[in-house]
């Protein structure tokens, strides 16, 4: 009896332990509701990092398969294999390293994949095909990892990865479809979306202004260096450096030459690769103690596609010569010309977006040590000397030679502005015979002789060297009239394509025509009547034989004009206005223009330096030309601009834009002067 009691107690203890363990195990599982979730291994990443999204199911009863639709922004993220980094393509199964749906040898597995990575869509599914055998096993897979997907960070900013509904998955629950082993759709579960992802710069990313010395004396030269560190994907930068011009003089640290309005920072390491067409510019205000410098790549796409970011190195250098003993500072400072800048710095990435989230490191104050006093030498007493008897001067006979004339200073000549031509061919300036050519001085200065001096009998005078000042030579001055405009919202839209009608207006205005220009020429197109806004321009350029219609009698005014077509019009303009002749093309410069109908025009304009191709050796003749490209081409061909010293006209064309000066040349009526370097400098904006 005693033995039976012991067995009974032992059995009860075992039963209690089993119940306790079971309740603990089931308790842990049942505490998690039925769900599918996507979790990111990090919610803060740097450009180039791979974020791993883990998709898992929990407590999905009798789970046998799924179909998912995942949406992300392809400008910020690239879907990749998390193990190899290989990009995911249209038919690539994105989810790898799962722990469920692995028994293909027993139940057969079916997969379906239809990704659209250009749109940022991953649509894929997987499931057991032999559901009968799977169901008979009595061992459903309820919890585990469906798979892991990698996302490579491309661009700074905040973005999301999420399950999202799509028309191709009717009945889906937030972009998810789950199936059980009876081939039924499961509906009772939650969908857990991942948190927002922030793609940022590294924590130590910064722009710094460093001085090679801060304790100096008068006459010393301080070298200030603008540096970048870990500025990932940087494609352009503008800096505004402020100093006291009464204490410091901005100079080239190597040559000592003073900075001028347009002097660039020297010795740049970053943003200077010619393969991506670097654009460097400066708008300094030396009198106010401001160095404003910008550099950027024009070919952002090629730079971005290289995958190699210039993030750490020297932006440029400037020297400061110490003029007087006074403590001072040199620093990066805000300016109204760079709105939204960070402590006087504005950085853009290779998508053309502003980069934020970096630090700006300023230099220490400059201490100027007073010049040491130079000891005064004690003069020694001069011993008395015996006075020599003075010699009786010999009278100098009168000279008969007439002295050379001493010219007075040559007066500066004020150039006279020529009248505005009424001929339609002259309004553009820069054309032969047009309004805006060189203006000759009105008169030649005549030297005025001095009177003939009377010779002195007592002493022969020492000849005095008279410095003859060089006459001030006026630069070439003239007028250029605008040939294109912006939009009413104060935008220029430099990246926008232009239509054939818009191009017709540009060339008509370039040649001085307007809506009131009368020409004796009849032309008609089936799709351009007199009420069309550009009919006057289309008629004019057709009269000039710059444009022709199509065989069906249409002009197609709303069709975008290509790079090849625009180049052809420019070539015809040079033929008619400047007498350009066709020359035999010995060798094709571009890989994609050989045999093209516009090869002659493209190659010859390129040889003249008016147009360029792309870094890959192509011209892309059939691509639509952009507004910024068109104005630059016209200016080069017609010998106009770029216009220096122009104010910002459009909100979307800052002074750092590669075509800023060319756009200003094209949209402003202005008087100009060519400086001694041949640069066109703005004198005055003329009202329309």
From Swiss-Prot:
Q: Which Gene3D superfamilies match?
A: 2.60.40.680
* Residues covered by region (Disordered): 372-477
Entries under InterPro entries matching the protein: CBM2/CBM3_carb-bd_dom_sf, Cell_Envelope_Struct_Comp, Cohesin_dom, SLH_dom
Location, primary (coarse class): secreted
Could you confirm whether the keyword Ribonucleoprotein appears in this record?
no
- The SLH domain covers 453-520, 521-584, 585-648, 649-669
Q: Which domain of life is it from?
A: Bacteria
Give the compositionally biased regions (Low complexity). Answer: 375-422
Identify the stretch annotated as signal peptide in this record: 1-27
Alphabetically, the GO molecular function entries are: carbohydrate binding
Please verify whether the record's keywords include Signal. Answer: yes
Q: Where is the composition biased (Gly residues)?
A: 424-438
The UniProt keywords, alphabetically, are: Cell wall, Repeat, S-layer, Secreted, Signal
Protein name as it appears in the record: Cell surface glycoprotein 2
The Cohesin domain sits at 36-201, 207-370
Q: Name one Pfam family in it.
A: Cohesin
